[in-house]
Curated annotation (Swiss-Prot):
Residues 146-166 are annotated as: Disordered. The gene is smpB. CDD domains: SmpB. This is SsrA-binding protein. Required for rescue of stalled ribosomes mediated by trans-translation. Binds to transfer-messenger RNA (tmRNA), required for stable association of tmRNA with ribosomes. tmRNA and SmpB together mimic tRNA shape, replacing the anticodon stem-loop with SmpB. tmRNA is encoded by the ssrA gene; the 2 termini fold to resemble tRNA(Ala) and it encodes a 'tag peptide', a short internal open reading frame. During trans-translation Ala-aminoacylated tmRNA acts like a tRNA, entering the A-site of stalled ribosomes, displacing the stalled mRNA. Belongs to the SmpB family. It is found in: Cytoplasm. InterPro entries: SmpB, SsrA-bd_prot, SsrA-bd_prot_CS. Its main location: cytoplasm. One of its GO terms (molecular function) is RNA binding. Pfam families: SmpB (PF01668). Gene3D superfamilies: 2.40.280.10. GO terms for cellular component: cytosol.
Length: 166
């Protein structure tokens, strides 16, 4: 019986390792009000995959555009792989194609064109052997909105701390 339990625990640990966060854009949640999210695939070359798995991706300045009916990821820095020569390495800031269904792309295109919203990369995560990018439809926050959100967050934190004390 102990052997079966060990196998289940090892399998659960393997699943947890296979579904992990690789990069997060925390600044985006502060600067934008995220209205809707979408999980997309991302078209990468081999050295980009190795760099992302090593945690060498920066989503902070990134944004997404819809051009020619395709979602494109711009200005996301993925560091060159250290063990590949210059010839086989990738351009760190190249434009990458995002993989999503046509209906989802058309829906986001209508929202971005109509309301003046923007598409922002929120996180890169590993799902099994696939690297997925979560993008968000965001509306820019003004300074007073950021302050109000920070105040609300602090009050929730204070209430939670008070509840734990009693």
């Amino acid at each position: 019986m102990a052997k079966g339990g060990a196998k289940k625990a090892a399998a659960a640990a393997a699943r947890a390792a296979a579904n992990r966060m690789l990069a997060d854009n925390r600044q985006a949640r502060h600067q934008y009000e995220i209205l809707e999210t979408l999980e997309t695939g991302i078209e990468l070359v081999g050295t980009e995959v190795k760099s992302i798995r090593n945690g060498k991706a920066n989503l902070r300045d990134g944004f997404c555009l819809i051009r020619n009916g395709e979602l494109q990821l711009h200005n996301v820095h993925i560091s060159p792989h250290t063990h590949a020569g210059n010839y086989f390495n990738h351009d760190p800031l190249r434009t990458r194609k995002l993989l999503a269904h046509r209906r989802e792309i058309d829906k986001f295109r209508g929202l971005v064109d109509q309301k003046g919203l923007t598409l922002i990369p929120l996180s890169l995560q590993l799902k099994g052997s696939w690297i997925k990018l979560t993008i968000g439809l965001g509306k820019g926050r003004k300074l007073h909105d950021k302050r109000a959100a920070e105040k609300e967050k602090q009050s929730k934190k204070d209430v939670k701390a008070a509840m734990e004390r009693y």
